[in-house]
Amino acid sequence: MDSFYIITNILKDKDYAVTDKICNYIEQKGKKWTLAKKDEEGHILPGTVPSDVECGLVLGGDGTLIRAIRDLEGEELPLLGINLGTLGYLAEVELKDYQYAIDRLCGEEHAAIELRMMLEGVAGDEKRDLAVNDIVLTREGNIRIVQFNVYVNGTLLNTYLADGVIIS
């Protein structure tokens, strides 16, 4: 891979010290990088991923990776999470191992790209959400118990009477 898209959680890398270190390492390998353009809420601006980018490096925790996946929905861009958080279940690469990971991505022996299953949650006719890890359905307002009809691929899986349901 020759070109990387860098997505940084600025709450985890406030002064961009880690981002700079990773970008400098990419340059040392003779490769290119582009820093993600974000709006004031921290979402990646649609249509700003350069066409020559081959991989996104997400610097943050699992939440940062999930947000990047949602923001980049529809892009054919593999993402690799570099964990700057406390728990890196989805952000698989620990910061101390970033050079090894980049070496693998840039080398002759490319790292394998895994396709991950994603869930799409639809509530009623209007609310739609993309999930990488789980979907949480909860009640609104003062309603005590709600009936949840859970469908999978259009087939009723089960009906639950509950305060909420977590689908993972």
Each predicted region: which residue ranges?
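Proline-centered loop/turn at the N-terminus of a beta-strand
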Residues: 76-78
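Active-site catalytic pocket residues across diverse enzymes, especially alpha/beta-hydrolases
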Residues: 72
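Conserved mixed alpha/beta catalytic, RNA-binding, or beta-rich assembly cores of soluble enzyme
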Residues: 167-168
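Divalent-cation-assisted or electrostatically stabilized phosphate/pyrophosphate-binding catalytic cores
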Residues: 83
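Catalytic core of DAGKc-family lipid kinases
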Residues: 87-164
